[in-house]
Amino acid sequence: MSQLDVLIVDDEESIRNLIAANLKDEGFNPKVAANSTQALKILSEKPVSAVILDIWLQGSEIDGLGILEIIKKRYPLMPVIIISGHGTIETAVNAIKMGAYDYIEKPFNNDKLVILLKRACEVTKLKRENIDLKSKVIDKTELVGGCSVTLKYKMEIEKAASSSSRIMIHGKVGSGKELAARLIHKQSKRVNNPFIIFSPTCMTTEKINQELFGESEKQENNTKRPTILEFANNGTLYIDEVSNIPIPIQVKLLKFLKDQTITKPCGKNIKVDIKIITGTSKNIQDEVNNGKFLEDLYYRLNVSSLKVPSLYERKEDIPLLVKYFVKQLSKFSGLKERNFADETIAALQSYEWPGNIRQLRNVVEWTLIMNPLTTGNNEIIKPYMIPSEILANSANLTKLEDSFDMLSMPLREAREVFERQYLSAQMSRFNNNISKTSSFVGMERSALHRKLKLLSLHIPPTNRINEEEYEEANA
């Protein structure tokens, strides 16, 4: 089985070490924590596959149930098995209601814990696969949006599709690298042939080797079935997060790229014809410099490069994206279609979206689920209905000076404070595009320029739309 990270949280060192030793023997990679501070620090650095959590933690700021609550908020799919030597039926019921996978009393049988842990990980894996499948059904191959950044991006995809060269897609997590790969395949001459996705993340070296080349350290696992490279023959293979491939497999992949020939464990050579597209959210050049990625392999995969714009760069597409996600969620998940109020869209446009398109889709889905229709009418989604963290972090738009503070100011000063914050928020919303901001706020471009200068609001050079606007705004 793949080596899965498991966090063990228990204030008794002997129990932590005993569970860790047993799990290591079973092929898991255990991590240990004695209190809430250590546990949450480990999770923030890298989420684990499962957590074994004691309820009563002496010397801990937060008890087990408190940690469970935090885990379920931050990592909803992460399975948590509660252990306790002082538990009651009521405690067990509360833990399950809060989202724990199961509850087991100390002292417990090690075999029982391992079976429970394996089952929890398998159930979670199936849930993730189901979510991924639903996401693929919904997103498929449609790039929604019409802003200048998106139109330019669509043209770059068309050019990439017309080329037979290998392509490396660079983009932040959730920005849509897989969608770009699908679009390239869809617009290429290989459209009627297979499009295969391979994600090495969370796979062991042996598993990757077996999937790509059909080889395994265990002779009985040397499969006769076609490998992923064979399945992709005459089509397109998309390797997601390619930097996660271990060096030994990188060497084999490099050898394969030279002549696109697979040598099966039986000794048979198979020639294939595959367009290879790779995706990465990391700076591969840095990985090369740090000895984590083969330089020769990087150059062979990065023949053509495509950068996926972040949602922050495509804020003007948010109204269209929201409508698209609402329709798709209504169609595939049975959620009722709703309209988002203009002020709600404005709040969404003012958020920075570190999770990009994927995060926006999740926010739209969460909003529809948590705000069911109370009447038969299409109730408008108001700002207070979207997640509070979106409102709290929206750039300035929801942070206008408190009205009580303004009451203590003279009219001229209060008006200046409001205008500065209002225009700063609108400029951020429209990505510092003077033309679109002036159109929305109802001012002439020249008047807006003067007002920005008067309020000492400067357009950052890195975000300006063009040189003319920048020079005019900051003259």
UniProtKB/Swiss-Prot annotation:
Residues 143-369 form the Sigma-54 factor interaction domain. CDD domains: AAA (cd00009), REC_NtrX-like (cd17550). Keywords: ATP-binding, Nucleotide-binding, Phosphoprotein, Transcription, Transcription regulation, Two-component regulatory system. Residues 5-121 form the Response regulatory domain. The modification 4-aspartylphosphate is found at residue 54. ATP binds at residues 171-178, 232-241. SMART domains: REC (SM00448). GO terms for molecular function: ATP binding; sequence-specific DNA binding. GO terms for biological process: phosphorelay signal transduction system; regulation of DNA-templated transcription. SUPFAM superfamilies: CheY-like, Homeodomain-like, P-loop containing nucleoside triphosphate hydrolases. Coiled coil: none annotated. Member of the two-component regulatory system RF_0895/RF_0427. PANTHER family: TRANSCRIPTIONAL REGULATOR (NTRC FAMILY), TRANSCRIPTIONAL REGULATORY PROTEIN. This is Putative response regulator NtrX-like. It comes from Rickettsia felis (strain ATCC VR-1525 / URRWXCal2) (Rickettsia azadi).
